[in-house]
Amino acid sequence: MMNQLHRIKIRESFADAVYGGDKTFEVRKNDRCYQKGDYVDFVVLYDSDGCEYVDHPLSKKRYEITYVLSGWGIEDGYCVFGIKQVT
């Protein structure tokens, strides 16, 4: 099975933390069947309204999913996945 590329929205304050290397995980509804080895491109939105796109350096980076956790205290239908920058 080929690795999927997911384009997912992220608020600007969280984008800053990912871009700075402080946030190396995402908590997401698992409606896309995230898998280890999949890729993530982030689409950054303003914090204030969450509707407008931001020209943020994170939008030019790609991340690989390194680990996916579901169950074990994670709400049904959600997952936490680890990410590392690849470009």
Regions found by a protein language model. Give the residues of each.
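Catalytic phosphate/metal-binding cores of nucleic-acid and nucleotide-processing enzymes, i.e., regions
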Residues: 2-87
